Amino acid sequence: MNGTEGPNFYVPMSNKTGIVRSPFEYPQYYLAEPWKYSVLAAYMFLLILLGLPINFMTLYVTIQHKKLRTPLNYILLNLAFANHFMVLCGFTITMYTSLHGYFVFGQTGCYFEGFFATLGGEIALWSLVVLAIERYIVVCKPMSNFRFGENHAMMGVAFTWIMALACAVPPLFGWSRYIPEGMQCSCGVDYYTLKPEVNNESFVIYMFVVHFLIPLIIISFCYGRLVCTVKEAAAQQQESATTQKAEKEVTRMVVIMVIFFLICWVPYAYVAFYIFTHQGSEFGPIFMTVPAFFAKSSAIYNPVIYIMLNKQFRNCMITTLCCGKNPFGDEDASSAATSKTEATSVSTSQVSPA
């Protein structure tokens, strides 16, 4: 074995030299130089510095402006809450443990951090799935005159929490477990061992299929159909400037959504799956740490992509920051012009971009 497995941890280094120690009790500077842990702490501080105000403003502005309290924005609000949740309950702990070079809060703290980080990430992921389904139903109209209302939005929010809990709770009760990963200063699901005592193999397969592959397939299908529908609408009315503009906006949004989803999560999922399917192979702590920490940046990308590119929301945020006045123009007029976000149907001459 090229790693050292303990009762509640797995350190990616052989203990032939006798230097491996529990990541809950001793600094892990034999895995990486101290400055690398400082870099991780600085990176987490940056995510906290950016993530807290962005996601807080998203929540605050939506609460302050009634025009933003639309069914679709309930999902966006849930997404921002999940990101804020990740920053407060996950990133702050990871920054502190990185400064110390090991997981100073013990096994209980590891389960706490692993649970809340997983829960927040899964809420965000399934919120993106619900958004994709909503956009598909509204734009592609597979169910004729279906109208996405408040009840549907609340059901969507409840669905994201149910799916997130279905992923984050089992390790707390003996189906898999949370352990320190990579450089041993943050916790996640155990991809490193088969651990038959906790049926780890079956949980990892369940997690990859249900909580990664299926969401990816749904998102890809929905936005793929959305692009095709918009192009068809544009082709039927070449003279319509509104349709042409909507096509460009939708295409841009879809490209950004899919690319950043893949950038954030595929490297982490690939490395985790590689480690799990190559038990006993040699890999360094950096191999898992870099993609794991990079995936955390989704808490910053999500509000920027899904909300900051929303013109109506951006106008409301500017108005809030400028004490009730929009120095860049008439907020009401601008909001009316961009109220396509609230659209729940697609006519032959207009396609709702977001």
Swiss-Prot record:
CDD domains per UniProt: 7tmA_MWS_opsin
Annotated region (Disordered), positions in chain: 331-354
Alphabetically ordered keywords of this record: Cell projection, Chromophore, Disulfide bond, G-protein coupled receptor, Glycoprotein, Lipoprotein, Membrane, Palmitate, Phosphoprotein, Photoreceptor protein, Receptor, Retinal protein, Sensory transduction, Transducer, Transmembrane, Transmembrane helix, Vision
Gene Ontology BP annotations: absorption of visible light; G protein-coupled opsin signaling pathway; visual perception
InterPro entries in the cross-refs: GPCR_opsins, GPCR_Rhodpsn, GPCR_Rhodpsn_7TM, Opsin, Retinal_BS, Rhodopsin, Rhodopsin_N
Topological domain spans for side Cytoplasmic: 62-73, 134-152, 225-252, 309-354
Extracellular topological segments: 1-36, 97-110, 174-202, 275-286
Membrane-spanning segments: 37-61, 74-96, 111-133, 153-173, 203-224, 253-274, 287-308
Compositionally biased intervals (Low complexity): 334-354
Disulphides: 110-187
Functional summary from the UniProt entry: Photoreceptor required for image-forming vision at low light intensity. Required for photoreceptor cell viability after birth. May use a mixture of retinal and 3-dehydroretinal as visual pigment. Light-induced isomerization of 11-cis to all-trans retinal triggers a conformational change that activates signaling via G-proteins. Subsequent receptor phosphorylation mediates displacement of the bound G-protein alpha subunit by arrestin and terminates signaling.
Family of the protein in this entry: Belongs to the G-protein coupled receptor 1 family. Opsin subfamily.
Name of the protein this chain belongs to: Rhodopsin
Organism: Aquarana catesbeiana (American bullfrog)
Gene name linked to the record: RHO
